Amino acid sequence: FDPPGTMRRLALAVVAVLLPLAAAAQSAEPYPTRPVKVLVPYAPGGATDIIARHIAPKLQEALGQAFVVDNRAGASGNIALEAAAKAAPDGYTLLVGNVSTNAINESTFATVMQTRPSRDLVGISKLVEIPHVFVAAISFPPNTVAETIEWAKKNPGKLNYASAGLGTYPHLDMLRFAKAAGIELTHIPYKGGAAQMLPALMSGDVQLAFINLASTIEQIRAGRLKAIATTMPTRVPELPNVPTMAEQGFPGIGTNAWQGLFAPAATPKPIVDKLHAAVVAALSRPEMKEMLAQQLMTVAVSKSPQDFTEQVRTETQAWSEVVRDNKVKID
């Protein structure tokens, strides 16, 4: 006669012994031995797709197997995000994600997402950062952050801003700025992103926006938009005379939008480390840096997968506080 639960405890003990052995055996196998799928959460042509298509051939060259880009657009990136989170943790399904998909969506889509990126994905490395710029319509009188705040306080209820939609980081960044500055701003979302935001800004229908530099640089240079500040820690070479948000008294306001490579959370560490090393080698090549610089992207590889994973978790927590404090919710 066995005491109650003995068989169950024995079974659990066997599983506890076998799982590490299975993981060790899997990680000891050569990797990769077949093509690797690289999920992109947006349609072709955007920044996330561009970096994925630049890095994939270099990973193929380094690791000897094809890295195939697979665009899974839709649901603000959540379709690809959830596909990656639910994939087998064997290194054969990766995700190129960004600050929106991997640090913000977990809070803004909390009631509808079936996965939690901070729990269900592991970071391999940050790839690039994309500078953003705080822009204004040419017809808007202020030229600095301080002047913008002064104008807003003298004209309550008259200052509005564009974003790519509720819960996007241009929206959340402006909420953070308004709170820090003690001003009120009216949000006008454009689901078409920069394609709709730019005409609205240039016509003066809206006065302000945080938007990526690549989308606005030509309009700024042509005098159709006004650059008030940039969001990187230091001034960007393309706009050397435009001070940063930090220089104007608002450090940490405005996102340095990053793109990064992720894998399912239980992917063996040797595979994650091997991918990280390949990414570092690929993005250290001068031709890659030059190619990405032409797209106004700055190479920004992480020191280690652990560092990147921790960065994303820290940012996820910070964005969750912004979302909670401003009662931003998407059902």
Which residues fall in each region the model found?
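Stable alpha-helical elements in mature extracytoplasmic
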Residues: 47, 51, 55, 59, ...
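An extracytoplasmic/periplasmic, membrane-proximal ligand-sensing/linker region
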Residues: 33-35, 179-183, 247, 269-331
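A ligand-binding cleft/hinge motif common to bilobed small-molecule-binding domains
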Residues: 100-111, 171, 176-180, 208-242
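Hinge/capping helix and adjacent helix->loop/strand transition within the periplasmic-binding protein
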Residues: 83-92, 99, 107-196, 245, ...
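Short, charged, surface-exposed secondary-structure boundary motifs
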Residues: 196-198, 237-241, 311
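Short, low-complexity disordered leader/linker segments with a strong preference
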Residues: 1-33, 146, 330-331
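N-terminal (or domain-start) structured segment
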Residues: 25-120, 158-160, 182-208, 219, ...
